[in-house]
Swiss-Prot record:
It comes from Opitutus terrae (strain DSM 11246 / JCM 15787 / PB90-1). The gene is groES. PANTHER family: 10 KDA HEAT SHOCK PROTEIN, 20 KDA CHAPERONIN, CHLOROPLASTIC. The lineage of its organism: Bacteria, Pseudomonadati, Verrucomicrobiota, Opitutia, Opitutales. Belongs to the GroES chaperonin family. It is found in: Cytoplasm. The keyword Cytoplasm applies. This is Co-chaperonin GroES. One of its GO terms (molecular function) is ATP binding.
């Protein structure tokens, strides 16, 4: 796990964006911010898990190190040491990239 100074709580997951640059014919680079698609990210840290009505904690389906897809506008963005992270609920993770 990366040495990050943010510890998620509950069912939250800390992810770090994986920046992709797409170069099209003619040498124009299209940044991710101009693309309308889910964002690829790496799971950096996990909270304690989602607590059900019965008080039991449901384990996460993702693990630290997983590459995941998150909604472009989901979660809360955080900048720490010049790196961009997002805190999302596990339910906001669209899928795991295998």
């Amino acid at each position: 796990m990366a040495n990050v100074k943010i510890k998620p709580i509950g069912d939250r997951v800390l992810v770090q964006h994986i920046e992709e640059k797409e170069q099209v014919r003619g040498g124009i680079i299209i940044p991710d911010s101009a693309k309308e698609k889910p964002q690829e990210a790496k799971v950096i840290a996990l909270g304690t898990g989602k607590k059900g009505e019965d008080g039991k904690v449901t384990p996460f389906e993702v693990k630290v190190g997983d590459r995941v897809l998150i909604s472009k506008y989901g979660g809360t963005e955080v900048k720490l040491d010049e790196k961009k992270y997002t805190l999302v609920r596990e339910d906001d993770i669209l899928g795991v990239i295998e």
